[in-house]
Amino acid sequence: RKAASFYSKEQIETICKPVFGSVQLGECLKQYCGDAEAQIDFCGVCTGICVISNVMIAKAFVPEERVCVIEKACACVTPESHRTAIEAMKTCQVDIQ
């Protein structure tokens, strides 16, 4: 909630998703990014499932935008699976911070 306080209510979109990836996220990104240059940051609990799924959706819907993953704000089932997911995203031109 504290991070959200930096943004006006018009800039906050809550997406409820019953599965790992969210097409609704991609549609929202496409709508909000428009012609303006944007950076989209991701973090999450499961790097190898939820994070990578949504990162790839973002890359598909807004391929020209900068998509970043905050590595230290992510985790996975094992350290090895976390590293594997991070390396896979690097290969797909995702910036790892």
Name each model feature, range by range:
Residues R1-Q97:
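Active-site-adjacent betaalpha module
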